[in-house]
C-alpha cells in the first residue's frame, strides 16, 4: 500500500456506503492507526459504522461492498445498529467512543454514559485479559507473533489507565509515551520495537508482571 491516500480512499468508501445504506447511516468514522495518523504500510483500515438497525442481510450487503475494494483484506472495524451500540458494555464501548474520528455523524452523545467506574473496569478487564493470554501463550502456544499482538493490545490499556489516573485522554501512542509512568512507557516502547526470538521469555515476564500489578491496583 505504498503511496496509499487514505483521504481519497475514505471518500470512495463513503460514497459506496451512502449508495448502499443512504440515510440509514447514523455514524461513520475511522479509528486505529489511520485515525491517529500513525499508520504504517501494514496497518489495517479500521472503520466504524452504525446504522439505524443491522440485519444479517445488511451484513451480507456490506460484505459484498468490502469485497469490491482491492484493499478488502486490510479493512476491519465495528458495525452495529443504534440499539446495540446504546446498550453495549460500557467499559468496552468507551474505547470506541474516545478513539474514533467522526466522518458522518457523532458519538459525543455517548460520552455522557460513562463514569470513572466504567473507565476502571476497562483498565481492569484489559489487564486481566492480557495476563491470561500472555500466561497461556508462554506456557502453551509459545507464539512470538501472539506476544507481539498482546503488546499492541496492551497500549490501549496503558492509554485508558492514563485517562483514569489523570483525566486526560491522549489518542497518539507516540505522544502518550511522553506522559505515562516508567513501567507503562516500557510497555509502549516494547510494543513499538522489533521482536527477536530470544526476546520471548523476558518480554513475556515483563507483560505478565505489569498486568499483575494493574489487576492488584485497580481491582476495585
Q: Model-found features: residue ranges?
A:
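N-terminal loops that bind phosphate or other acidic moieties
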Residues: 46
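Catalytic core of pol beta-like nucleotidyltransferases
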Residues: 1-19, 23, 35-42, 52-220
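Short, glycine- and small/hydrophobic-rich beta-strand elements in well-ordered beta-sheets
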Residues: 23-31
